[in-house]
């Protein structure tokens, strides 16, 4: 937060993603009033709570291909390899060589304030994935900003709607809701900072387009959390990170369902 009237770090809106873990937070900042700078006590600029004291907050552990791969392995009869998106964009890896592609986005999104470029689908990746789908591929995508990060331009929206077969309906920022229903299960994801896995402060509500259909909904309510499409190619897209599903058993069951959807005749 950096305006003429307010300053600070709003952990309730976005707690950030620590490198591996973070022990430096004592609590969420509660006072952002610039006129209270230089003062002490409750209400002063920068005053915060104490709810995070003693907590080793989980961050980016850089092992998400392993987490996804473990779920793939549990499904049986499948092998997997992993690579960076840059390897695909630079032509070092060809998606058409693989019957199924799992595109892991996590909390990646474009941020004008960041020096690093973390666009969910770069222009190059859009072209590559379009070719892969048109060749009859099976594409699994998961991430918290698959809709919101692609809603700004008509070209980006056309890619998600015409190729991946989903539209963006808004972001769910109510952190009291951490349950998602689908594939016969009720799963949970962490919405607040914790010691187990990175927090997902906002998730995307994505709706099916064309002949796609909803496969997950946020609970309570019925906002769509994931879609699947079956045509000349197949897509399965989640508006939340797959690796944020807290139960390993749930991840294995859901991955088996996704792979089954891709391979069934």
Over which residues does each language-model region extend?
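A glycine-rich, often tryptophan-bearing local segment used as a flexible ligand/cofactor-contacting loop or short
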Residues: 108-213, 220, 254
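Alpha-helical scaffolding within the catalytic cores
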Residues: 85-92, 123-128, 220-225
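The substrate-binding groove and active-site-proximal loops of carbohydrate-active enzymes
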Residues: 53-59, 103-120, 241
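Short loop/turn segments at strand-loop or loop-helix junctions that form parts
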Residues: 1-5, 98-110, 143-144, 238-240
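Extracellular/periplasmic catalytic domains that process cell-envelope and extracellular macromolecules
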Residues: 73, 93-97, 132-135, 207-209, ...
